[in-house]
From Swiss-Prot:
Subcellular location field: Virion; Host nucleus; Host mitochondrion
The UniProt record lists the keyword Acetylation: no
Quaternary structure annotation from Swiss-Prot or TrEMBL: Influenza RNA polymerase is composed of three subunits: PB1, PB2 and PA. Interacts (via N-terminus) with PB1 (via C-terminus). Interacts with nucleoprotein NP (via N-terminus). Interacts (via N-terminus) with host MAVS (via N-terminus); this interaction inhibits host innate immune response.
GO cellular component annotations of the record: host cell mitochondrion; host cell nucleus; virion component
Any one GO molecular-function label of the UniProt entry: RNA binding
Principal location: virion
Superkingdom field: Viruses
GO biological process, alphabetically ordered: 7-methylguanosine mRNA capping; cap snatching; DNA-templated transcription; symbiont-mediated suppression of host cytoplasmic pattern recognition receptor signaling pathway via inhibition of MAVS activity; symbiont-mediated suppression of host gene expression; symbiont-mediated suppression of host mRNA transcription via inhibition of RNA polymerase II activity; viral RNA genome replication
Protein name per UniProt: Polymerase basic protein 2
Source organism per UniProt: Influenza A virus (strain A/Leningrad/134/17/1957 H2N2)
Positions occupied by motif Nuclear localization signal: 736-739
């Protein structure tokens, strides 16, 4: 009521009425803007205005007991007035200074753990080196880059579950931590954050930084890994760049880099196998990168690279809808086309069957070192605007665009026959044939393309057939631009299908990727890549094949031993012995195999001649298709270290050396593992092989007479029991089986039962 009276009183004064009625308030919008809503419209002004007041800050009442009323200089730190509209007190900025200097100390042990990403950034900058500044035109192109170094690769949803579990473990709500990485991180963080006093909200924010990849679409001219992006503002301007070497690596960049190398190796290897798709999947599932399963990384990591995308497609994951040709990523920005098969004649009168794209289309082409805009019609290049780091990169882009245009003058520029093959010795498809041909030598292509006069357009320049720049003339339709072409920004992913030969198609049937598009660049991975698949043993050369083959036999000796005695053919056909065949001289492979198989058969027939070391040593040679011959060998040759080296059939050699005392096997001086049983005992390791058809009943039973040797067992009648002396001088009681059908399981249980009987 008081307020209303006051207002009436004001209005009765003529001056008030005059001000309010005569002042033009023609901008209702402005008044609305500054008076409606809770959002501060001019924060910096508001801040300055507030800070000019004596007590601009409010604090909890308890602060008055923790802070003196005045500081050492006698300035008042808080007001006795309480804040209007809340039960807080008004505090001076000087109170903050006092608190920072004299307030209570808490433990700082958790800070480096919570603010890990910041602490690590400081370290990287401390140890980084900044070089000279160069002034030059920067060709920047927008790319999707990772702006957050040092993160794991969880999806937003996975991270949310981890954060809730770590920060608010007792909150209600369904949280299912399924992936390996989720569980590991949760356990680690819970331990780190015991008794942590930092506000849960802050902890949650910082955890999010650590767990989730954040990407932005930024103009970049140079390194795109996250340790370069974090200093982008220091390393490149509009007309300058500063050289910089990061002072440390981060795992997320290492994962991206190692993933690309692993994927390329796997796709290249799968392409030459009998069933590329099955092989690729087998390898992806059995490979680890830096201790994490490759398939888990593929599910989480958004890296777009040809080989990585082929692996993702094989796993049924969505990938980007752009397609790849000649190492460039093409994205159609407008137009459409239909495809039609057409036969064309090369300059050498060779017939090629190509799929012609009919219709007008525009594309962006983005490569590692060059980018372009391409406009084309049916078998005709209308315009190509290229920008790139150097002449070489620009030429690469021009060749790819000319081939992609399918123009007749390009096809007529072919000299000689086209017979390029892929790694599996299959002919490449015609478009890749043309591409390879001109990548080798584009002289004729550029000469025959044709030249035109050009207008002077800002930022554009012509390019002549010898790749020199010109302002007067240019190859037809071609211009070089100072400006780069941005990468396709959308992160949209589409469902794709993949065929047996690793060709990836979108739902309309357009080929997006194929093994031909996978880069041949070799690099050294930053994280250890462990390929468990035998297909990848070759990647490190012949020695690695040799060591891996023998390691595999030793690791799986229990099963190998049983198969050796019961189903040798199945054993010889195992894919793990495939890589080994490339080490054996082709001319003699068959004879070696026949010889070893005969030797093994004799071992099976003559009881007690079983020799573990010898079986392991010779087994890989038996895998080749055998040739029957009377030839005997005392040593077998393998091609390693650039020459033939010998493996002795009986005894040790530098290639295969078994130390009886330590039971360790060394292959070419490298440790290949330990044999669990002693191969010297004529019968050791033969237990499960020889006690086929006998049931082990238990420990020795004197009622059944003295212990027989294994060789004497064969005289027992079905159902008869006897004590038998096995391997290391132990005696067990056995009974000869009445039926033969259960023989297979015998050898599998024999070893276990013998152990039990002895112990």
């Amino acid at each position: 009521m008081e307020r209303i009276k006051e207002l009436r009183n004001l209005m009765s004064q003529s001056r008030t009425r005059e001000i309010l009625t005569k002042t033009t308030v023609d901008h209702m919008a402005i008044i609305k803007k500054y008076t409606s809503g809770r959002q501060e419209k001019n924060p910096s002004l508001r801040m300055k205005w507030m800070m000019a007041m004596k007590y601009p800050i409010t604090a909890d009442k308890r602060i008055t007991e923790m802070i003196p009323e005045r500081n050492e200089q006698g300035q008042t730190l808080w007001s006795k007035m309480s804040d209007a509209g809340s039960d807080r007190v008004m505090v001076s900025p000087l109170a903050v200074t006092w608190w920072n200097r004299n307030g209570p100390m808490t433990s700082t042990v958790h800070y480096p753990k919570i603010y890990k990403t910041y602490f690590e950034k400081v370290e990287r900058l401390k140890h980084g080196t900044f070089g000279p500044v160069h002034f030059r035109n920067q060709v920047k192109i927008r790319r999707r880059v990772d702006i957050n170094p040092g993160h794991a690769d969880l999806s937003a949803k996975e991270a949310q579950d981890v954060i809730m579990e770590v920060v608010f473990p007792n909150e209600v709500g369904a949280r299912i931590l399924t992936s390996e990485s989720q569980l590991t991180i949760t356990k680690e963080k819970k331990e780190e954050l015991q008794d942590c006093k930092i506000s849960p909200l802050m902890v949650a924010y910082m955890l999010e930084r650590e767990l989730v990849r954040k990407t932005r679409f930024l103009p970049v001219a140079g390194g795109t890994s996250s340790v370069y992006i974090e200093v982008l503002h220091l390393t490149q301007g509009t007309c300058w760049e500063q050289m910089y070497t990061p002072g440390g690596e981060v795992r997320n960049d290492d994962v991206d880099q190692s993933l690309i190398i692993a994927a390329r190796n796997i796709v290249r290897r799968a392409a030459v196998s009998a069933d590329p798709l099955a092989s690729l999947l087998e390898m992806c599932h059995s490979t680890q990168i830096g201790g994490t399963r490759m398939v888990d990384i593929l599910r989480q990591n958004p890296t777009e690279e040809q080989a990585v995308d082929i692996c993702k497609a094989a796993m049924g994951l969505r990938i980007s809808s752009s397609f790849s040709f000649g190492g460039f990523t093409f994205k159609r920005t407008s137009g459409s086309s239909v495809k039609r098969e057409e036969e064309v004649l090369t300059g050498n009168l060779q017939t090629l069957k190509i799929r012609v794209h009919e219709g007008y289309e525009e594309f962006t082409m983005v490569g590692k070192r060059a980018t372009a805009i391409l406009r084309k019609a049916t078998r005709r290049l209308i315009q190509l605007i290229v920008s790139g780091r150097d002449e070489q990169s620009i030429a690469e882009a021009i060749i790819v665009a000319m081939v992609f245009s399918q123009e007749d003058c390009m096809i007529k520029a072919v000299r000689g026959d086209l017979n390029f093959v892929n790694r599996a010795n299959q002919r490449l498809n015609p478009m890749h044939q043309l591409l390879r041909h001109f990548q080798k030598d584009a002289k004729v292509l550029f000469q025959n393309w044709g030249i035109e006069h050009i207008d002077n357009v800002m930022g554009m320049i012509g390019v002549l057939p010898d790749m020199t720049p010109s302002t007067e003339m240019s190859m037809r339709g071609l211009r070089v631009s100072k400006m780069g072409v941005d990468e396709y920004s959308s992160a949209e992913r589409v469902v794709v299908s993949i065929d047996r030969f690793l060709r990836v198609r979108d739902q309309r049937g357009n080929v997006l990727l194929s093994p031909e598009e996978v880069s041949e660049t070799q690099g050294t991975e930053k994280l250890t890549i462990t390929y468990s698949s035998s297909m990848m043993w070759e990647i490190n050369g012949p020695e690695s094949v040799l060591v891996n083959t023998y390691q595999w036999i030793i690791r799986n000796w229990e099963t190998v031993k049983i198969q050796w005695s019961q189903n040798p053919t199945m054993l010889y056909n195992k894919m793990e012995f495939e890589p080994f065949q490339s080490l054996v001289p082709k001319a003699i492979r068959g004879q070696y195999s026949g010889f070893v198989r005969t030797l093994f058969q004799q071992m099976r027939d003559v009881l007690g001649t079983f020799d573990t070391t010898q079986i392991i040593k010779l087994l890989p040679f038996a895998a080749a298709p055998p040739k029957q011959s009377r030839m005997q060998f005392s040593s077998l040759t393998v091609n390693v270290r650039g020459s033939g080296m010998r493996i002795l059939v009986r005894g040790n050699s530098p290639v295969f050396n078994y130390n009886k005392t330590t039971k360790r096997l060394t292959i070419l001086g490298k440790d290949a593992g330990t044999l669990t049983e002693d191969p010297d005992e004529g019968t050791s390791g033969v237990e499960s092989a020889v006690l086929r058809g006998f049931l082990i009943l238990g420990k020795e039973d004197r009622r059944y007479g003295p212990a027989l040797s294994i060789n004497e067992l064969s005289n027992l009648a079905k159902g008869e029991k006897a004590n038998v002396l096995i391997g290391q001088g132990d005696v067990v009681l056995v009974m000869k089986r009445k039926r033969d059908s259960s023989i297979l399981t015998d050898s599998q249980t024999a070893t276990k039962r013998i152990r039990m009987a002895i112990n």
